[in-house]
């Protein structure tokens, strides 16, 4: 019998399907102490040890305390919701928490695999790749499977991380793909500053140190530099997709023009 354990940060509940029980802490009520005693008795009876929760800003920051025992085999369920970025306190996806949780699961002998639910438009190249590598490490060291389920969207970085999955499932209304890399928008406000009578001065150690500045023109050389960085990241993306989907790189390049695909198209 293999249950599931939800490690997500969306609410203050701990959920499992061992015995069909769910537990939620209540505060400020006269029955609080009685409820806690009853829950503890039930947990001891069925051999479940509930891990300690720490909360930061109302969000669950960690659901693992040391080498926790779940009292039986289980599959971890993780959510990747929102932009995949390296911001520990973001309200949706928490990169530090996710990386820590996956690393802890490696040493959890009761864990038998991971299911990741994705609803993300993507994120930074760095954090997407770091999460992908952590999942590949988990698979390599544990020989356990990783499954993905695509919800509303799993695009760009959200698709990238799924290349670590053994299997991918998607809602029929999912939008995915968007295989590509881009810089942030580069603005040129020199014309506006001229109209306002504002002049700027920047002292640099080299002609390309200030490239991308809103107050200087992007030269052909600088455009080539930025394009080379984008191309390098794109080539890495293509390689990851080719490996994860068992496709040739040439075929991936044919379809990886940045567009999104429906679930049926991506299949």
Label each region the model flagged.
Residues 4, 10-144, 153-244:
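Small-residue-centered hinge/linker elements
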Residues 147-155, 256-259:
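Glycine-rich beta-to-alpha transition loops that act as phosphate-gripper elements at the mouths
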Residues 237-267:
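Secondary-structure end/capping motifs
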């Amino acid at each position: 019998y293999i249950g599931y354990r939800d490690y997500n940060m969306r609410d203050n509940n701990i959920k499992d399907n061992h015995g069909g029980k769910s537990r939620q802490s209540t505060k400020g009520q006269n029955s609080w102490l009685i409820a806690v005693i009853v829950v503890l008795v039930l947990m001891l009876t069925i051999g479940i040890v509930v891990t300690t929760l720490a909360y930061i800003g109302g969000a669950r920051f960690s659901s693992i305390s040391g080498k926790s025992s779940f009292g039986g085999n289980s599959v971890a369920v993780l959510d990747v919701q929102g932009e995949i970025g390296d911001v520990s306190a973001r309200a949706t996806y928490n990169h530090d928490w996710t990386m820590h949780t996956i690393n802890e699961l490696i040493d959890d002998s009761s864990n038998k695999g991971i299911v990741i639910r994705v609803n993300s438009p993507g994120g930074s190249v760095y954090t997407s790749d770091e999460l992908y590598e952590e999942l590949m490490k988990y698979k390599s060291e544990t020989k356990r499977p990783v499954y993905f389920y695509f919800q509303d969207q799993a695009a760009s970085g959200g698709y990238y991380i799924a290349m670590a999955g053994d299997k991918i499932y998607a809602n029929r209304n999912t939008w995915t793909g968007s295989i590509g890399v881009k810089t942030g928008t580069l603005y040129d406000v020199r014309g506006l500053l001229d109209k306002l009578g504002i002049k700027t001065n920047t002292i640099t150690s080299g002609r390309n140190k200030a490239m991308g500045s809103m107050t200087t023109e992007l030269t052909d050389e600088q455009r080539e530099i930025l394009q080379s960085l984008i191309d390098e990241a794109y080539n890495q993306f293509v390689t990851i997709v080719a490996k994860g989907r068992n496709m040739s790189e040439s075929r991936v390049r044919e379809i990886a023009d940045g567009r999104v695909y429906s679930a049926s198209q991506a299949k």
